[in-house]
Amino acid sequence: MGAFRFHQYQVVGRALPTEKDVQPKIYRMKLWATNEVRAKSKFWYFLRKLKKVKKSNGQMLAINEIYEKNPTTIKNFGIWLRYQSRTGYHNMYKEYRDTTLNGAVEQMYTEMASRHRVRFPCIQIIKTATVPAKLCKRESTKQFHNSKIKFPLVFRKVRPPSRKLKTTYKANKPNLFM
């Protein structure tokens, strides 16, 4: 969707064929980036670390953006991640409620930046999954599973009963709080 900063991409690549290895192993990775160029860059970064395949002797086979199947239904998403802080590397599990996985990932990046001061390059998403309501662990997501949930009415704005009684300028400021 156009509204999200991060998009999910599926990147497929391999090492260049050589005489020793005519058909090199193909690697597929799903990752989040702001655009295709950054997705490719992230793919080669991880492939260099995991499988010793560099971009200079590698080949990009395909790159496609992955879209949400049902972007209008609310789901619980679990995100397993690894991040680098000032003290070292940490593993973490986070839960979010959103309509799309991209929205949940965006929430995760925002929360990690605010709570832990960890920016986008220092975060590695290991795994994501749609979590059923009974398997949710975090209280922040469980609180919305109640079908009889009520939200407080913080303030009430009194509107005129007809357009004829609507005025541009009021004699006194309305009191909105109860």
From Swiss-Prot:
UniProt-listed Pfam families: Ribosomal_L18A
The keyword Secreted is annotated on this UniProt entry: no
Keyword field contains Oxidoreductase: no
One GO-annotated biological process of the protein: translation
Domain of life, source organism: Eukaryota
GO terms assigned for molecular function: mRNA binding; structural constituent of ribosome
SUPFAM superfamilies recorded: RplX-like
Keyword annotations: Ribonucleoprotein, Ribosomal protein
Record's GO cellular component terms: cytosolic large ribosomal subunit; cytosolic ribosome; endoplasmic reticulum; nucleus; plant-type vacuole
HAMAP family for the chain: Ribosomal_eL20
Family under the similarity heading: Belongs to the eukaryotic ribosomal protein eL20 family.
Official protein name in the record: Large ribosomal subunit protein eL20y
